Amino acid sequence: MKLDFSIGQGADIVVNYILDNFTPALDAIAATIGFVANGVQDLLVAIPSLAGIVILTLLSLWRVGWKFAVFALLALALVEHMGLWRAMMQTLALVLSATLIAVVLGIPLGIAMARSQRVAGLVRPVLDLMQTMPAFVYLIPAAMFFGLGVVPGTIATVIFAMPPMVRLTNLGIRQVHPEYVEAGLAFGCTPWQLLFKVQLPNAMASIMAGVNQTIMLSLSMVVIASMIGAGGLGNHVLTGIQRLDVGAGFEGGLAVVVLAVILDRITQSLGKGGSGLFRRLSLRSAAASPAGKSAGG
């Protein structure tokens, strides 16, 4: 007796059922994500390239240091010279939108995992599946439910990039020193006060590492998301591959690398307190304060 069961047919039935019965919910999700993604993209694209270069260079100087600021200035000027500034802003908008949504969804989920072993046991296999699934697979449901364009590209990117945000939020809260928690409880903190005044502040370094990893994974989805109309630098790389145009593909890839390095260093500085002008000014301010003078004296 042959068992006739097709996983593919089952998947088709589920997808068709969702499309037939949950179209209003899908439209609401698409409208919300489209509002965020298109709003961020319109804002970034509207900034003149010279102003954008100045802003990112000053931010690099403020958070990282003057050497990296010089690199950022030259690298961004090169991207502008290649005529890829607008495409880079579209890619940055996709990354920021996906990261924002991943943070909004990932931090509460990580908190729930840290507070409940049952939730952690349910969510952890899902995160494992999300991280081991090939990135191309996410394009299929995104395109089927939401069509082509920025919205399905953002959704696929969020699904691919969110697991580190959840895991590192959970890890950061669990690694808060028990003495801090005991001190908070001794002073009469409610569970919510303990979370927001003790656990989250002490887990911030781990949470920012999660943000950094989410941004990097979002950038790694740029070319893949362009296959369903996300646009940006990924579209230039994809066009270069399709036409066997090595130069166009190399330019698009180089611009992605520039954006990745700048975002990586800046977000790392946010988690570690920075090493640039911001940190030096903070140290000078601390040294000039009465407490600093008395300690030094």
Outline where the language-model segments fall.
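Interfacial loop/helix-cap signal at membrane boundaries in integral membrane proteins
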Residues: M1-P48
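Transmembrane-helix boundary motif in ABC transporter permease subunits
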Residues: L58-R63, L76-R86, A98-L127
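Transmembrane alpha-helical segments of polytopic membrane transport and secretion proteins
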Residues: M1, R265-G297
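Glycine-rich helix-loop "coupling/hinge" segments at transmembrane-helix boundaries
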Residues: M144, I173, S218-L259, S275-R280
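Membrane-spanning helices that line or support transport/gating and their immediate boundary helices
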Residues: A87-T91, I111, G121-P125, L168-Q175, ...
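Transmembrane alpha-helices
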Residues: I155, I159, P191-A225, G247, ...
